[in-house]
Amino acid sequence: MKKIFGFGRKKKGDPPPGSTASPCPAGAYELRQKELGKLHRAAAAGDLAQVRQGLKKHGVDGRDKAQRTPLHLACANGHADVVTFLVESKCKLNLFDNDNRSPLMKAVQCQQEKCVAILLEHGADPNLADANGNTALHLAAVAPNTFLAGMLIEHNAHIDAQNKEGCTPLTLAVSEHRQEMVELLLKKGADVNARDLCERTPLMTAASGGELKLVKVLLRYGADLSHKDTNGWTAEDYAIIHGYDSLSNQLAEYADWENTGEASAGATRGISVPMTPHKARAAGFTLGAPAVDRGEEKIVKNTEEERNSLLSRHQEQENQGKVFCTVVF
């Protein structure tokens, strides 16, 4: 899956090593002091006295060259007292910077919990989207910060909001291997079968990464094993394509069990899939041990043949212009 956040990457215009830029948490702005006005510098530094003084001469919503307001900078750097003062001074809460991110998004991205709480309590919109279509909840899912995610959901953040690739916060949490976040979102009602622009589900994403624990969590909440994406592939196919032969065999066993209520002996030696209100029927099946009862050598050979067949068919479709989504290795 394409990475669309860019956390930790060096952006054009970032100061070179050894330059005098303000230290910042992950996701925060890289700042050159000389490029900021007095009010913006004071907000970024958390100097409340200077912020008070600056408001006598400058508008509370003044922008710098990157379209950041003092509130953006105070939120990114976690200066809750400055945030409170600016909010009480009637600053606008939902203005965008150059990346189309609001102060709330920056506070979430930088995991400034007090600032997030202040903004939400004063009516900041949790459902605004940045240049990539990500909302504050997408950013919390990737952080990952379950406390912030829970707070956003309590303030009516759309739990199944889709970014420009069609990914929901759940899909991103799965792609980043964040099991605690995945479980929180599912408990809060996230769609376990949400589909991106290529019709891929979170289960397919988990299978692509060989994430057995996440696969089990998703199955407990009713993930659909039979669903096919725009290439006609299932989660089992994705496990095969990415070389997770044991997982693909277990998914096949699970599908057989769902359809017939019976599973082979090899599929019953793994870790049980606990019963939940969402997936009570999964209590009778175990997932986790290699399904070796059909002959291990034969399985390896068959999955290798299946992988080659799938990739060959994909190449043929691609040559004919019928492929909408490519394989990501």
For each of these PLM feature ranges, what is it?
Residues 1-38, 155, 188, 220-224, ...:
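Ankyrin-repeat-protein effector appendages
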